[in-house]
Design a protein with these regions (language model features):
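A short, surface-exposed helix-loop junction/capping segment
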Residues: 122-130, 298-308
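An accessory alpha-helical subdomain
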Residues: 131-134, 306-313, 317
């Protein structure tokens, strides 16, 4: 086994990065220590991929400095391959092994000069060979093929195959396998668990835990963060800054909770100070009113002096209280975002599941339903308040089932009965072309709800919806569901495009949702903790298990 590498140095100093007029990162300073495994989290569009490209040297900051030292090489996995469909598989492998290919060329060049080499040339040649051996350069291509198999790719590696003939998942797995096979000291990975099944993700986690160098990975996968990372960097979309949390994902969750508690304390302290200032002003106004304004003619002496002193003192206290109140109201402490809570009113007027006059009308019945080519014959009954997790391979009909339950599709045979109030969170994005703002589309009351939950910054409420990131539009859809009383909630990949902190809130909100829930998700942590029934859809007739 080759010796561990612990020489990586990553330092960002006052880094600012903009695209056109939009500032993505603003005066960001942070450090990554040698050997750390860093998870980068944040809202979609917050600048996580930008941060990785800056570290990889693919982009330059507008201001500030990015210093990356990794003598053992840098491997950068982007979310998409930067090659045309006509490029070959071998081109993608060469791109990922570029450091090794460069080492090979330097070794060949040094070998061509060995017959007239000076002692220092021989030393340099030895260093090149040592670096090449440390990276396992001799069998890198074999490792690409072996890694591809561990990532779930069954087809043999054909270097002459066109990239355009691979699926999107196939291209992602190829890029990841080649990046890992290069064995660089520093791994920069952008959503490495995308397009991997559970077995492949488990292998990837073990591989990264055994990695000899430093890892910086952008990911939404909470279980991956929990198992792999030692440090979390959160890219704040609103503040355009980066905050560091130690002790892995557990430390991130603890730090977020502590930050929320601090914000609640500061907000309550500000409210108490406002109340105190108002009370002080009101009290002194009352005292001031009780002081005689005119003294009897000829009245003088100590009594007159005390009266004038009381008048002056009360006026001063009123003025001071009003000035303090003005300062407090001019610089208000914003309240912490309200947690997500689904509305708990149901069709029969109850606040949850169970028997009652409306229980039957709140149940779900799927009787021998089928859609040829999209969904195999299926029968299903859900009582009010039941929870169902729908699983199965891609293309088996999970989303189709949700659209049937939402009344957006008609079955070719059989029947579907659902409660009157049904909410569906779609996997696709219905708002990506909407030119109007959030306020214009949904109204001010809804916009206030979104802002109150901390789902969007106030400035984003007046931007065109299509200009928002996919994650921001996803949160719009979530807020729409939160605001409505629902009997049946249908969630199709609800964690897509959402930062882990928002997913944690969604998970807590679902735990208190009293209606019927049907969930489709690839989120391993959400699946593992799911408390209800499970239905695995198959190509053949399926039945729900208890």
């Amino acid at each position: 086994m080759r010796a561990p590498l612990a020489t990586t140095r990553i330092v960002l100093s006052e880094v600012t990065k903009s695209y056109d007029t939009r500032v993505v990162l603003d005066r960001v300073s942070c450090t990554v220590r040698p050997g750390e495994r860093v998870g980068v989290v944040g809202d979609n569009g917050s600048g996580k991929s930008t941060l990785l490209r800056l570290l990889a040297g693919r982009e330059r900051p507008d201001h500030g400095e990015v210093a990356v030292t990794a003598p053992g090489g840098v491997g950068h996995l982007a979310q998409t391959l930067d090659l045309p469909p006509t490029a070959r598989v071998g081109d993608a492998v060469d791109l990922a092994l570029a450091d090794l290919r460069a080492l090979e060329r330097r070794i060949r060049a040094a070998e061509s000069r060995l017959h007239r080499a000076e002692p220092e040339d021989l030393l340099a040649y030895g260093d090149l060979l040592a670096a090449y051996e440390a990276r396992g350069g001799h069998d890198a291509e074999r490792r690409v093929a072996a890694t591809l198999r561990r990532l779930g790719e069954r087809a043999e590696l054909d270097p002459d195959r066109r990239l355009g003939t691979l699926s999107g998942g196939g291209r992602s797995r190829l890029a990841l396998a080649a990046t890992l096979a290069a064995e660089p000291e520093l791994l920069l990975l952008d959503e490495p668990t995308n397009d991997l099944d559970d077995e492949a993700v488990a292998w990837l986690e073990e591989h990264l835990l055994a990695h000899r160098g430093t890892v910086v990975a952008v990911t939404h996968d909470r279980l991956f963060l929990d198992r792999v990372t030692t440090t979390v960097l959160e890219v704040d979309h609103d503040r355009r800054t980066v905050r560091r949390y130690g002790n892995g994902y557990a430390g991130y969750r603890t730090g977020r909770a502590a930050e929320r508690a601090r914000r609640e304390r500061e907000y309550e302290q500000w409210r108490e100070e406002v109340r105190d200032a108002e009370r002080l002003a009101d009290t002194n106004i009352g005292r001031f009113a009780a002081i005689p304004r005119k003294l009897p003619r000829g009245f003088s002496g100590a009594g007159a002096f005390r009266a004038r002193s009381r008048t002056h003192g009360a006026a001063s206290r009123i003025r001071a209280a009003r000035e303090r109140l003005a300062r407090l109201t001019a610089h208000p402490v914003p309240p912490p975002p309200r947690p997500l809570v689904f509305t708990g009113r149901f069709t029969d007027g109850s606040d949850g599941a169970g028997a009652g006059a409306g229980a039957e009308m709140r149940s779900v019945e799927v009787a021998d339903v089928a859609l040829p080519g999209r969904l195999a014959p299926l029968s299903l009954t859900l009582a009010p308040g039941e929870r169902l997790l729908v699983t199965g391979p891609n293309g088996v009909g999970k989303s189709t089932l949700l659209h049937l339950l939402a009344g957006e599709l008609e079955p070719a045979r059989g029947g579907v009965r659902t409660p009157p109030r049904v909410g569906l969170l779609r996997q696709d994005d219905p708002w990506q072309r909407e030119p109007r703002s959030v306020v214009e589309v949904f109204g001010q009351e809804y916009a206030d709800l979104v802002a109150g939950h901390g789902l969007l910054a106030p400035a984003d409420l007046v931007r065109p919806v299509r200009a928002l990131s996919a994650g921001q539009r996803r949160k719009l859809e979530l807020a729409h569901l939160v605001a409505r009383p629902l009997d049946l909630l249908l969630l199709d990949e609800p964690t897509n495009h959402l930062a882990p902190a928002v997913v944690e809130e969604l998970e807590a909100a679902l735990a208190h949702f009293g209606g019927t829930l049907v969930l489709v998700t690839h989120d391993r942590r959400l699946r593992a903790a799911f408390p209800g029934r499970r239905l695995e859809l198959q190509r053949e007739p399926a039945a729900a298990s208890r």
